Amino acid sequence: LVMSTARHHRSNRGLFDQRSLALEEPEPQPQVLTAPARKHLWFCIYLPNLPLEASGPGDEARAVVAEQQGVHRVLLASGRAEAAGIMPGQSANAALALLPTLHIEPRSEIVEQQALENLACWLEQFTSVVCFAGADVLLVEIAGSLRLYGGLLSLRQQIAAGLEQQGFNASLAIAPTPLAATWLARGGRRACIRDTANIAAALRTVPLASLDWPAATCESLAGMGIRSVGDCLRLPREGFARRFGPQRLIELDRALGRLPDPRSSWRAPERFCADYELTEEQSDCELLLAICRELLLSLERFLLTRQLGTQRVLFSFFHLKGSATQLP
């Protein structure tokens, strides 16, 4: 079912002997008076349950499965399914044996991407800078929006409430750099850091698993007893870069605000098009109407964000056989 609209109006001294990753204080330099640079503030939205939540909110017992070595295994399960004993890693057959009424959905990265894009569209009402930072992470730059939305606390509450209303269980964090905000959110630290000088302290206990670094790098560091960002920052810089590559050091410096971290802002297409993929043929009118209403709500968010209207809405119903049915 597709609906579209027309165009709108991270110390091992035996291995390292250089300076630690924490930079030494530079010699004081004469100050030149310049216009103050605009401070950034990044709001990160991490969606750890996106594969389950992408298909929309629901109270029923559900599980998302993914194929692993030829076996379909549970990736995520809803609260009601978990209460019945369904856990990630179980085979789909074992899950159904525990709960025959369990609704199983195959993971769809397309549906997840669409849900993330819909969320990005909704976030554009708060700021013009919306960035994708992974398959389950969105970043918005909010420094310029604070006054308009009643300050940081008010803006955070509005975004958090909107996410909950749309059925998303998000981990949120705010920091002056996009990477710091992302690592804090992925580490489950619901932090709000406004000063760059406080980033290192906030990141100290964040586990390396939250950094999205290669597994081999994290395993090698863990073998040395390095398990957090704070552990990494105590290592000598040159030795760290030589052993693990300069990119990891660059990422740490970007997270701490020592290096710039430019991001590309995402813009929604001018033409709205949304679809809903059914797992099987359906003739239930009430179900189809509910799906249409969900698509219309997505359109409403798209239009309200841009203060636009549309003159025409087209629904297309694709059948297993035969041509599509279109309802203008």
Which ranges hold each PLM region?
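DNA-contacting surface of Y-family translesion DNA polymerases
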Residues: L23, W42-C44, L98-L102, C218, ...
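Structured, non-catalytic alpha/beta "coupling" segments that mediate domain-domain communication
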Residues: G150-I193, Q247-R254
